[in-house]
Amino acid sequence: MRIIPAIDIIEGKCVRLSKGDYDTKIIYNENPLEVAKSFEAYGIEYLHLVDLDGAKSSKIVNYKILEQIATQTSLKIDFGGGLKSDDDLRIAFESGANQITGGSIAVKNRTIFEKWISEYGSEKIILGADAKDEKIAVSGWLEESNEDLVPFIQDYQNKGIQYVICTDIAKDGMLQGPSFDLYSKILAEAKGVKLIASGGISTFDELPKLAELGCEGTIIGKAIYEGRITLKQLENYIIG
């Protein structure tokens, strides 16, 4: 299972929020590149990089940080947050993203998101399915939609999506453990999906459980920054 640490960016700094609420922001490091290099030093290969300024302003903002991390580490980066236009996407890939995650755009502008899937392919485009009570949430989680989570994922599988990052918003940044039941349900009903679990990871022991369920990967944020899971533990897990 892929281990994917997260770096969330506000005003160029590495932060974490609780339940996606911008008022709860804690700054963990002024230098995201340093954080990324520390991940790489422990054998980590993947990075989930979120432009929270972008998510709020509906256009790419922190692409310079993406570029720095992409040029100065060999991490495979999936980048998300506010990608709304062909231009945003071009900038993200030109700045060094290996994959991009589309969340709000997949709800609010299906035409453009489906075009991206067909143009760039399913290895490059990840569906961000962020849910609250099994309804999809959009715009940095500030709005709920009427889309039901599992049918939404299935619909995009039919359009060619393979990778799905699913965040249970109620769990995100709360360090109370991930939504095992929700992920079991998705894996049972959206057959063949490459599911990346996100939100709530709080202890190392949860990782083998997510792997057992069949998750393709897991995104870990606050648990690393708060020292609940150490980079050494992750290194040992990756080495196997």
Curated annotation (Swiss-Prot):
GO MF term list: 1-(5-phosphoribosyl)-5-[(5-phosphoribosylamino)methylideneamino]imidazole-4-carboxamide isomerase activity
Enzyme class: isomerase
Pathway recorded for this protein: Amino-acid biosynthesis; L-histidine biosynthesis; L-histidine from 5-phospho-alpha-D-ribose 1-diphosphate: step 4/9
Record's signal peptide: none
One family name in Pfam for this protein: His_biosynth
E.C. designation(s): 5.3.1.16
Subcellular location: Cytoplasm
Active site residues according to the UniProt entry: D8, D130
Keyword vocabulary terms for this entry: Amino-acid biosynthesis, Cytoplasm, Histidine biosynthesis, Isomerase
GO cellular component, one term: cytoplasm
The keyword Amino-acid biosynthesis belongs to this UniProt entry's keyword annotation: yes
GO biological process: L-histidine biosynthetic process; L-tryptophan biosynthetic process
PANTHER family: 1-(5-PHOSPHORIBOSYL)-5-[(5-PHOSPHORIBOSYLAMINO)METHYLIDENEAMINO] IMIDAZOLE-4-CARBOXAMIDE ISOMERASE
Protein known as: 1-(5-phosphoribosyl)-5-[(5-phosphoribosylamino)methylideneamino] imidazole-4-carboxamide isomerase
Species the sequence originates in: Flavobacterium johnsoniae (strain ATCC 17061 / DSM 2064 / JCM 8514 / BCRC 14874 / CCUG 350202 / NBRC 14942 / NCIMB 11054 / UW101) (Cytophaga johnsonae)
Lineage of origin: Bacteria, Pseudomonadati, Bacteroidota, Flavobacteriia, Flavobacteriales
